[in-house]
Curated annotation (Swiss-Prot):
GO terms for molecular function: endogenous lipid antigen binding; exogenous lipid antigen binding; lipopeptide binding. The gene is CD1C3. Residues 322-332 are cytoplasmic. Residues 1-17 form the signal peptide. Disulfide bonds join 120-184, 224-279. GO terms for biological process: adaptive immune response; antigen processing and presentation, endogenous lipid antigen via MHC class Ib; antigen processing and presentation, exogenous lipid antigen via MHC class Ib; positive regulation of T cell mediated cytotoxicity. It comes from Cavia porcellus. Heterodimer with B2M (beta-2-microglobulin). This is T-cell surface glycoprotein CD1c3. It holds the Pfam family C1-set. Residues 205-292 form the Ig-like domain.
Length: 332
């Protein structure tokens, strides 16, 4: 979900954004997981995603869409939005019946999962691209290409049989084509427009350093913590002067409850070589003002503060005790 503001303007203005802007793409897609425990039990889970941001959920009990943001409806009319849950209900019902009827024929053993990912991508200066992929128990099974169902190599003969069957249903092929090539791009543009205030927000990261003993004697594991930033794309690196430390290891970017992100970047280094290292953070919210924290500087400040405050506190306590003793001595 990179540089959404540029993408939005690029789409609306027909690709007129300066060529110096890094070209990215944005996608909207639906995720489906259907779990079949036995011949009579199936659970369908669905969700909608704008890039890496979840925008929709699916209530399988009521057969309704869950809108996770105030702008999750995009600019579709109420009539259009009412048609979509009905379409999903028909799809899930039909899929369950077909699958249960053909489990033996396809030699599929319970329990098993069917996954699907369908949506569209917008690339700067290019027409929208639709996609639809299906998987069985986590392995690629089939895809939709050029108005036809195509088996994946991992799916083997079983996938070929399913595609041969699906390709006989012209109505299903036309519906799939219409959804990923027409409906999805229109809905994606509507989401970008309706949610542009949220999607374009910039939140500066907070950065701090820490260390922990390494398993190897004489070494330290330095950690650079970056928290509370939005949007997600960020660059963090341990540096020595202008030299990037290639041994830097980046963890997963983890979400906060408020929609911002957290990242921890570490460097395994000899304790005697830690001096002179720094952590550098680049983020769109910082513009060109990178955050740079030097290892040891914060520790030095703490030690200096501790060295000044502790004697001062002790001196104050000593003075108070002396005054108290003098007071007691003056009492007859």
């Amino acid at each position: 979900m990179l540089f959404l503001q540029f993408l939005f303007l690029d789409v609306v203005l027909g690709g007129s954004i300066t060529k110096n802007v890094v070209q990215e793409n944005i996608s909207f897609y639906l995720m489906q997981i259907s779990s079949y425990a036995n011949q009579s039990w199936v659970q369908n889970c669905g969700s909608g995603w704008l890039g890496e941001l979840q925008t929709h959920g699916w209530d399988s009990e009521s057969g309704t869409i869950i809108f996770l943001h105030t702008w999750s409806r995009g600019n579709f009319s109420n009539e259009e939005l009412e048609d979509i849950p009905l379409l999903f209900h028909v799809y899930f019902s039909g899929l369950s019946l077909e699958v249960q009827d053909r489990v033996s024929q396809l030699q599929i053993k319970y329990p098993f999962d069917i996954q699907a990912r369908a949506g569209c991508e917008l690339h700067s200066g290019e027409p929208p691209k639709g996609f639809l992929y299906g998987a069985l128990n986590g392995l690629n099974f089939l895809s939709y290409q050029n108005k036809s169902w195509v088996p994946s190599p991992e799916g083997g003969n079983r996938a070929q049989k399913v595609c041969d069957l699906l390709n006989t249903y012209e109505g299903i092929k036309e519906t799939a084509y219409h959804l990923i090539r027409d409906t999805c791009p229109r809905f994606l543009l509507g989401l970008l427009d309706a949610g542009k205030m949220d999607l374009q927000r910039q939140v500066r990261p907070e950065v701090w350093l820490s260390s922990s003993p390494n398993l190897k004697p004489g070494r330290l594991l330095l950690a650079c913590h970056v928290s509370g930033f939005y949007p997600k794309p960020i660059w963090v690196m341990w540096m020595r002067g202008a030299q990037e430390q290639l041994e830097t290891k980046q963890g997963d970017i983890l979400p906060h409850a408020d929609g911002t992100w957290y990242l921890r970047v570490t460097l395994d280094v000899a304790a005697k070589e830690a001096a002179g290292l720094s952590c550098r953070v680049r983020h769109s919210s910082l513009r060109d003002q990178d955050i740079i924290l030097y290892w040891g500087h914060g520790l030095s400040v703490i030690l200096i503060t501790f060295a000044v405050i502790v004697p001062l506190v002790l001196l104050i306590i000593l003075v108070l005790l002396c005054k108290k003793c003098c007071t007691y001595q003056g009492i007859p």
